[in-house]
UniProtKB/Swiss-Prot annotation:
It is an enzyme of class 1 (oxidoreductase). Binds 1 FMN per subunit. Its EC number is 1.6.5.-, 1.7.1.17. It catalyses: 2 a quinone + NADH + H(+) = 2 a 1,4-benzosemiquinone + NAD(+); N,N-dimethyl-1,4-phenylenediamine + anthranilate + 2 NAD(+) = 2-(4-dimethylaminophenyl)diazenylbenzoate + 2 NADH + 2 H(+). It comes from Mesomycoplasma hyopneumoniae (strain 232). Belongs to the azoreductase type 1 family. The lineage of its organism: Bacteria, Bacillati, Mycoplasmatota, Mycoplasmoidales, Metamycoplasmataceae. This is FMN-dependent NADH:quinone oxidoreductase.
Amino acid sequence: MNILVIKSSVNEKKGSYSSHLSDLFIKFYLEIHPEDQIEVYDLNQFGLANTNLTIKNFEDKTFYQKAESDFWINKLRKADKIVFSTSMTNFNYSATTKNFFDAITVPNKTFLLDKNTGKYTGLLKNIQNVQILTAQGAPLGWYPFGNHSALIKQIFEFLGAKVRSDFFVLDGTKVAPNNQKPIADFVAQRQNQIKILAENF
């Protein structure tokens, strides 16, 4: 089984809650499936982190080259399962995540459009499951318009991936007393939930 782990928080260097979630999830998963192949990618280390879609690079097609679109699409095509983590940034997922989805949402590569019927068909049907792990500073419900986790789920489903696992949101990271705790300690408080997700993945 090939597991593709994608990290997309802008706080990776300072310490990312969502990245800690991902690391803990993979730790538990490997305890159950030590034979599986794990590939981990921090999107911040690649060109797409600083390559956003604009009118110019869309028209001249250079966006897809600079964002290494084919590289990421090929990684997705070879994966059996995905672990995707990011944090909420200004009520949405990170700009790096947006760049990633722009790079992989490509007609005739990851989805088909029937112009006669308007029907879309996702092509990433090889992906058997996606575990979405996110973090946000506010408690759940503070920003009902900012459901970044559900949006990520819907995009993967649009592209043909199965998302059988419930997404997990580590919320309230910026409010007391949570913001007084080391990241690892706060994440560890939810480790039983993460372990169950890993067991069912």
